[in-house]
């Protein structure tokens, strides 16, 4: 019998008071940091896969064990779905497969975003499914929307638009903050409860089985 998952506990019950300040500062500054060698090596795997079979891309950032990446490949059969996670331990739990419709990379997500932008590679769909919520108020800048790499996320589709982005979390505040950050960047979208359906990730299944409310932000690119 599985132990129920705990709800997110935070000393920040509402939107962070410095959210707009932090997001706007990052949007003005942009982002450029040295890419870690292991991330650069992982990106070469992606370039090789595209050279062998050119396809549009779907990105599954913070993919964990890659369960979601395989599921997304079934949803996007005309794309190469790329799952990225920094943890070799988590990725090692993915069942061995000879699948060619998805690729798992051990790399820092911000590094991969930076390399995609630098190489002019666009992403049609970008999924951020249950990233670490960093629930302490002091950790705002560790959250996706509070991190310095947030501007890269906005440049991952053709024409410099963010493509179709979907973020899910079991912490409503996190999703609402992400939605506001996207709005500040000029990208329309909506926040809503996630409707019932097959779980895309193992966390999603566990949270739903534990009775958590699940939340989703979705954005449609303006082509």
Task: For the regions a language model picked out, list residue spans one by one.
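Conserved beta-strand/loop positions that form the S-adenosyl-L-methionine
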Residues: 61, 84
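Class I SAM-dependent methyltransferase "Motif I" SAM/SAH-binding loop
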Residues: 62-66
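Conserved SAM/SAH-binding beta-strand->alpha-helix loop
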Residues: 87
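Conserved beta-strand signature within the Rossmann-like core of class I S-adenosyl-L-methionine
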Residues: 161-169
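Class I S-adenosyl-L-methionine
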Residues: 175-223
């Amino acid at each position: 019998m599985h132990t129920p998952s705990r709800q997110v506990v935070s000393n920040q019950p509402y939107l962070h008071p410095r959210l707009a300040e932090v997001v706007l500062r990052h949007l003005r500054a942009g982002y450029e940091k040295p890419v870690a060698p292991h991330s650069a090596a992982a990106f070469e795997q992606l370039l090789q896969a595209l050279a062998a079979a050119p396809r549009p891309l779907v990105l599954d950032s913070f993919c964990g064990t890659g369960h979601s990446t395989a599921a997304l490949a079934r949803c996007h059969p005309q794309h190469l779905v790329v799952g990225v996670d920094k943890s070799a331990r988590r990725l090692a739990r993915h069942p061995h497969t000879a699948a060619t419709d998805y690729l798992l990379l051990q790399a820092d997500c911000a590094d991969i975003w930076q390399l995609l932008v630098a190489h002019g590679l666009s992403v049609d769909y970008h999924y951020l499914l249950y990233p670490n919520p960093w629930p302490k108020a002091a950790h705002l800048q560790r959250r996706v929307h509070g991190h310095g790499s947030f501007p890269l996320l906005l440049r991952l589709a053709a024409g410099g638009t963010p493509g179709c982005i979907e973020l899910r979390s079991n912490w409503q505040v996190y999703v609402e903050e992400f939605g506001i950050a996207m709005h500040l960047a000029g990208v329309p979208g909506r926040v809503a409860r996630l409707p019932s359906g097959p779980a895309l990730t193992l966390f999603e299944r566990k949270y739903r089985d534990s009775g958590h409310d699940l939340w989703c932000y979705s954005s449609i690119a303006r082509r």
